[in-house]
Swiss-Prot record:
Cofactor(s) of this protein: Mg(2+); Mn(2+)
Name this protein carries in UniProt: NAD-dependent malic enzyme
Source species: Salmonella newport (strain SL254)
One cellular component term from this protein's GO annotations in UniProt: cytosol
Residues that coordinate or bind a divalent metal cation: E246, D247, D270
GO BP annotations, alphabetical order: malate metabolic process
Protein family membership: Belongs to the malic enzymes family.
Keywords: Metal-binding, NAD, Oxidoreductase
Main enzyme class: oxidoreductase
HAMAP family: NAD_malic_enz
Pfam families, A to Z: malic, Malic_M
Keyword Metal-binding: yes
Cofactor binding remark: Divalent metal cations. Prefers magnesium or manganese.
Entries under InterPro entries matching the protein: Aminoacid_DH-like_N_sf, Malic_enzyme_CS, Malic_N_dom, Malic_N_dom_sf, Malic_NAD-bd, Malic_OxRdtase, NAD(P)-bd_dom_sf, NAD_malic_enz_proteobac
């Protein structure tokens, strides 16, 4: 963790007594000094000893270790977050590799499923459809006036778990925790939001503890009008906001991104963030093998908005490497539950239509099947890269992986579905089926694989390598939009930090302990590209770096001075 080179300015605080202790952004707990306890009416409300934040963090770490299940650890950390945010982030940064899977995937999935059961205290904004006409008033109720990043979900497609209704709030909370822990964005600048448009999850509707609007999901024109009211209210309240769409259903994710990306500074992490980290990983893996991404044939299992978003960014990258658009598209094969996407397949979604293969080019394939399965595609394409974004467990079978390995000595296999229970194949199986020759990157965290007395580290293709840096870059540069080129610059920067590329060994992605360094580098690349593209005011490189440093928040207590409201 970086240390400050100069003492931070004092904060002037209008709150005192129990009110101050109940304010998570300002509460220091036992770390309030003797003078602060006297000035803020805290004398006698805290134990005698004045502790440092490291002493507090050590106690919290010991308490954390006493919990045996991941969900109990998650609940404990969320309680600290809702009590003392500075301590929460110091603790998480001290133990990032241990705690990141607890505050986010995979544990956050269980927290979303059990949201109403484990609910302790409100965090963020809940906007239900019955309150749609009070949108402006609701946002005015947010006490933080300087919000810079919103993560919003409607809870319909939470990870691979489907419709979790209001329980989806766990995702924006977790995501914004990583914006701060990994990207240094002050928690005072962040706001999680859930749009409660009902739920089609009958189990939730029947649950007496369910805290959301008990109604089937609104759809079509009503739904889009509601989202539009929200967007307009956000623009009115915080005109310079960065808005991240998160875990919207496939039918809504791409239309919302397309509709609003040129109206408000926004992006969809499931589509664009996943694509950026995947492309960064593939660039690094290709370079480590002495080749380029444009030389690879790539097969996808899963042709939803996330899979197609990754495919389009791969195509853009291979065009940058010199391929024509037609040649780039001929190297990418999309398979969904109906088989390979072809130009004769009916009822394709608009974002799928550009990713079809021409049936005329498949006449020579060795198959008698009308529907071209994943095995058919792997057998005939002989891919170098296999990517899973299906949300269905076990679909990368032994037969498929062994067939791929027949024709590719060092296959790259990326089962990216979340959470762990939905992964297309486990790293252990993939390593065994390829005789230890596969390079594996997963969406959820996995322990290193031991096979024939050799240890194989498993890279987690985690969006947290990308979105915190993008957020920091947008804030530091004042970018008004997030362009495709800004996302590509993030991918390229991530690839440049690959230990496998730089050292010839190790993981294809940086260690999590280095994620703040990576986020700062991505922030600079994104901010610079924003300036080049005219969506941010041009400054010198030194000024941009200074803006990044100035906006990089550290979990350290500041001295307080008393003032009136």
């Amino acid at each position: 963790m970086e240390t400050t080179t100069k003492k931070a300015r004092s904060l002037y605080i209008p709150y005192a007594g129990p009110v101050l202790l109940e304010f998570p952004l300002l509460n220091k707990g036992s770390a309030f000094s003797v003078e602060e306890r006297r000035n803020f009416n805290l004398s006698g409300l805290l134990p005698e000893v004045v502790e440092s934040i490291e002493e507090q963090a050590e106690r919290a770490w010991l308490q954390y270790q006493g919990f045996k299940t991941e969900i109990d650890k998650h609940i404990y950390l969320r309680n600290i977050q809702d009590t003392n945010e500075t301590l929460f982030y110091r603790l998480v940064q001290n133990h990032l590799e241990e705690m990141m899977p607890v505050i986010y995937t995979p544990t956050v999935g269980a927290a979303c499923e059990r949201f109403s059961e484990i609910y302790r205290r409100a965090r963020g904004v809940f906007i239900s459809y019955p309150n749609r006409h009070n949108m402006d008033d609701i946002l005015q109720n947010v006490p933080n006036h300087n919000i810079k990043v919103i993560v919003v979900t409607d809870g319909e497609r939470i990870l691979g778990l489907g419709d979790q209704g209001i329980g989806g709030m766990g995702i924006p909370i977790g995501k914004l925790s990583l914006y701060t822990a990994c990207g240094g964005i002050s928690p005072a600048y962040t706001l999680p939001v859930v749009l409660d448009v009902g739920t089609n999850n009958q189990q939730l509707l029947n649950d007496p503890l369910y805290m959301g609007w008990r109604h089937p999901r609104i759809t079509d024109d009503e739904y889009y009008a509601f989202v539009d009211e929200f967007i307009q209210a956000v623009k009115q309240r915080w005109p310079d906001i960065l808005l991240q769409f998160e875990d919207f259903a496939q039918k809504n994710a791409m239309p919302l991104l397309t509709r609003y990306r040129d109206e408000i500074c926004s992006f969809n992490d499931d589509i664009q963030g996943t694509a950026a980290v995947t492309v960064g990983t593939l660039i690094a893996a290709s370079r480590a093998a002495g080749s380029q991404l444009s030389e690879q044939k790539i097969v996808f299992l899963g042709a939803g908005s996330a899979g197609c978003g990754i495919a389009e960014q791969i195509i853009a990258q291979t065009q940058r490497e010199g391929l024509s658009e037609d040649a780039a598209r001929q190297n990418v094969f999309m398979v969904d539950r109906f088989g390979l996407l072809t130009d004769r397949m009916p009822n394709l979604l608009p974002f799928q239509a550009k990713l079809v293969q021409k049936c005329d080019n498949l006449q020579h394939w060795d198959t008698e099947n009308d529907v071209l399965s994943l095995l058919d595609v792997v057998r005939n394409v002989k891919p170098d890269i296999l990517i899973g974004v299906s949300g269905q467990t076990g679909l990368f079978t032994e037969e498929i992986i062994r067939e791929m390995h027949k024709h590719c000595p060092r296959p790259i296999v990326m089962p990216l579905s979340n959470p762990t229970s939905r992964v297309e194949a486990t790293p252990q199986d993939i390593i065994a089926w390829t005789e230890g020759n596969a390079l594996v990157a997963t969406g959820s965290p996995f322990s290193p694989v031991i096979w024939k007395d050799k240890i194989y580290p498993i890279a987690q293709c985690n969006n947290a390598y990308i979105f915190p840096g993008i957020g920091l870059g947008v804030i530091a540069s004042g970018a008004s939009r997030i362009t495709d080129e800004m996302l590509m610059s993030a991918s390229e920067t991530l690839a440049k930090h690959s230990p496998l590329v730089n050292n010839g060994e190790g993981l294809v992605l940086p260690a999590l302990k280095d994620i703040q360094v990576v986020s700062r580098a991505i922030a600079f690349a994104v901010g610079k590209m924003a300036q080049q593209q005219g969506v941010a005011v041009k400054t010198s490189a030194e000024a941009l770096q200074q803006a990044i440093d100035d906006n990089f928040w550290k979990p350290e207590y500041r001295d307080y001075r008393r003032t009136s409201i």
